């Protein structure tokens, strides 16, 4: 049997982990079960990734990369700032509707990581990366269209992600396209207004 290098085995194990946990949940994602899913020895998982936490981190990175790649591909080349953001958000929402299992797995992994001290660093890194990627997309759209951002792109990105995560959870829990659309439209409108300095921020009294 031909030798398979760790570099070659890595994407295979990530896919096996995603397939298994999408089907059976994060709790089922032991290194033994993931190895069995791929048909390799359990030691192969540890040799390739070191720890289960490292594998989980790689799964989160892969799921995020796949979603971001799909969204970036939808960016229009000659549209205005609002139209560009709308197209990007529409593409991301399409992944929620068409690939709910991927978003559910990301949510489950995030909640699992909150309860697992050894995964907290991976979770923080994941959210930082998602925020940075979102901020970059906002920045690129603004620069291409000559739109001056009223707030830092990272602030706009965090606001958008907070709203989108909530809409995603609603859709996963109670799918209703008709009921969900106004919320999505309101989120995009608010993001555009925030980016353009047309959304007044109220003062929150300290507690």
Tell what function each PLM region has:
Residues 122-129, 133:
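Short, solvent-exposed amphipathic helices
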């Amino acid at each position: 049997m031909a030798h398979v290098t760790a570099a070659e085995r890595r994407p295979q194990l990530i896919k096996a982990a995603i397939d298994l946990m999408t089907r059976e949940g994060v709790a089922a994602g032991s290194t033994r079960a993931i190895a069995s899913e791929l048909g390799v020895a359990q030691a192969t998982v540890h040799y390739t990734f070191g720890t289960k936490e490292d594998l989980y981190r790689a799964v989160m990175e892969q799921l995020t990369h796949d979603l971001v790649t799909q969204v970036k591909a939808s960016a229009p080349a000659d549209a205005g700032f609002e139209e560009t953001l709308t197209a990007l958000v529409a593409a991301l929402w399409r992944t929620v509707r068409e690939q709910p299992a991927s978003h559910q797995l990301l949510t489950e992994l995030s909640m699992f990581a909150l309860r697992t001290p050894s995964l907290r660093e991976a979770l923080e890194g994941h959210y930082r990366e998602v925020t940075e990627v979102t901020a970059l997309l906002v920045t690129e759209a603004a620069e291409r269209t000559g739109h001056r951002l009223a707030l830092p792109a990272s602030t706009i990105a965090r606001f958008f992600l907070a709203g989108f995560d909530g809409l995603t959870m609603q859709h996963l829990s109670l799918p209703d396209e008709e009921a969900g659309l106004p919320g999505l439209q309101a989120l995009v409108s608010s993001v555009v207004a925030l980016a353009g300095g047309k959304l007044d921020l109220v003062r929150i009294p300290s507690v």
